[in-house]
Regions:
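Conserved beta-strand scaffold positions in the cores of enzyme catalytic domains, especially
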Residues: 17-19, 120, 186-188, 232-234
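P-loop (Walker A) phosphate-binding loop of NTP-binding proteins
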Residues: 95
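Small-molecule kinase domains that catalyze NTP-dependent phosphoryl transfer to phosphate-bearing small molecules
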Residues: 26, 192-248
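Short, well-ordered alpha-helices that flank and scaffold nucleotide-derived cofactor binding pockets
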Residues: 8, 105, 109, 113, ...
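Active-site cores that bind ATP or allylic diphosphates and position pyrophosphate for catalysis
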Residues: 1-85
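ATP-dependent NMP and nucleoside kinases share a basic, alpha-helical "lid"
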Residues: 129-135, 152-211, 217
Length: 253
């Protein structure tokens, strides 16, 4: 397919192609041969580039010695670790009191038990350090989320798991973070908890203060929360425990 596509656009690209046919491995003769020259009764083996990625590298399987030298297979395994060793960003989003931080803590424990390097970036904690001095205007909220996203992207780039728990109410900003991290490494987890349940859990009295008008621009009361349209996971904390929800995330990963 790649050769056909390049041939089709070679004039436009100004790049010529030296075509080559597929080679397969003759198991009994222990040699390679161009596919059109292989006898019909011969036993052959072949692996495509897609199979190398999906069936071997992504699953941590060793490439067979007939396909490549062990030294090369080892280098490929280090350069393209299996999915369970790749970096990832688990981004919890939802209203205050929806269960983000609690589920994130349980998930962190599970991942550490599995031998993964996991780092929690809690929105409230980040505000007191990395984002100290920022307010709650839309601009400041976006800045806070992007700072968390930047740190998460660095963790992911070095093979770690960034577990981020932040209200992150705006779709556009969450998408910015997705692009920052890389769409294939970003797992958006929407904690789908009704507002009334979040208010019942209001241990800090923030919702009550917002209802009284003591706090302005509080998400869910007088500032909007934009629900994710297509999150990787949608979890309900009313019908499932934090342990069950964390297990669902591990299973997804």
């Amino acid at each position: 397919d790649a050769q056909e596509m390049l041939s089709r656009y070679s004039d436009e690209l100004g790049v010529g192609m030296v075509p080559f046919r597929e080679f397969v491995y003759l198991e009994e003769e222990k040699r390679y041969e161009e596919v059109s020259r292989v006898p019909k009764a011969a036993r052959v083996a072949s692996i495509s580039g897609t199979q190398v990625r999906e069936q071997y590298l992504n699953r941590g399987r060793t490439l067979p010695e007939w396909f490549t030298r062990p030294e090369v297979a080892e280098i490929l395994g280090e350069a393209y670790p299996p999915r369970h060793r790749q970096g990832a960003c688990i981004w919890f989003t939802g209203l205050s009191g929806s269960g983000k931080s609690t589920t994130a803590e349980v998930l962190t424990t599970l991942l550490l038990e599995c031998g993964r390097q996991a780092t929690v970036l809690d929105g409230d904690v980040v505000r007191t350090h990395l984002s100290k001095g920022l307010g709650f205007s839309k601009e400041d909220r976006d800045t806070n989320i992007r700072r968390i996203g930047f740190v998460a992207a660095e963790i992911v780039r070095h093979g770690g798991v960034a577990i981020c728990a932040a209200v992150s109410p705006y779709k556009a900003t969450r998408n910015d973070v997705r692009n920052m991290v890389g769409a294939d490494r970003f797992v958006e987890v929407f904690m789908d908890t009704p507002l009334e349940v979040c208010e019942q859990r209001d241990a800090k009295g923030m919702y009550a203060a917002a209802r009284r008008g003591d706090i302005k621009g509080f998400t869910g009361i007088d500032d909007p929360y934009e629900e994710p349209e297509n999150p990787e996971l949608r979890l309900e904390t009313v019908v499932a425990t934090p342990e069950e929800n964390a297990a669902s995330i591990v299973q997804y990963l």
